[in-house]
Amino acid sequence: MNITETFLSGAVSGAGSGQPKHVVTAISNIFVFRDKAYKVYKSDSQFFNENFNDLSNKKNRFNFTRKDFEWNHRLSPEIYIELKGLSQEGNGTALVDPSDTCEELVIVMNTIDMSDQVIRKLIGGKINLDDCYEIGKQFGERTLSFSKPEINITTYQDFLNRYADMVAWVKSVKEVDQNEADEYLAFVKNFIEEKKDELDTTELMGLCFDVHADNAIYSDGKFLPIDTYAPKEAWLYGFKNINIYRVATDFYVFIGKDAFDKVIEGYEKATNQTLPRDWDKFMILYCELIMWPYQYMLSEKESWRVDIANKHREFLKTIWNG
């Protein structure tokens, strides 16, 4: 079965009528109808299969899809509706209850207006300080629906693993000034070692959502994280405050320190915790060493991302010299 042709021809019983918009990502095909969107993971993304998760294996792909849906449905049920299977029925193709015998698994979502994507609203100056507080608060409230899993790795060891991944991530992007990046990476590594005794515990570990300005919607005062299931299983757990620092740092880049503080303030209110603010510089550099290269990666298909990547670079310089 050619999944793409089947959806584009409008031949899937139970899906929308007419021809959908076809959105192609590195690892998925998304078919967007007027009210619903249908996401199917690819099996042939060599880079993803070799470096993150081997989706060429059907059993593994189905397992990944199930976990992805369950995770995102719990965090943003307004968007992630249900999981279905795609199967041959008679002479046609239909959405059915998901099972291992299906041709593919399909994540069914309510459609979203991408003009409400947080990155686009930040670029357009459409988010104010009150919004920042509300976003931090709502994000904190949403994370409370997840219980803390049993995690055997210490925060210290996890940060060392993440640091190794980060070095490879940064060095894989030719547009990144490696001399600048090496300075920031050295700071991150030294901080981890200096805090070894404090980090050498599992108590600081928690679930990690792949959440940032590209992976969230802000519409009518509601903050909706999207696509937050990490591509690599090891990244699903980590220092419990990585999540909010990733969100808050993006607001710092575009709006300023007051916005950063407001996001954190709202999160602290919702979760009844106090963040270690003496870690701010470390956490900001950590988050930016993810987002700076990432924006260059995205610029291969969206040229406007170069300006965003350069904005992250200048922000890093400001934090470094501040």
Predicted regions and their residues:
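ATP/Mg2+ or Mg2+-diphosphate-binding catalytic cores
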Residues: 291-322
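Long amphipathic alpha-helical segments
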Residues: 176-184, 206, 303, 322
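Electropositive polyanion-binding surfaces
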Residues: 196-205, 220
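Catalytic-loop of the protein kinase fold
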Residues: 203-209, 213
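Walker B beta-strand of ABC/ABC-like P-loop ATPase nucleotide-binding domains
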Residues: 225
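Conserved ATP-binding subdomain of kinase catalytic cores across diverse folds
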Residues: 3-191, 197, 213, 221-222, ...
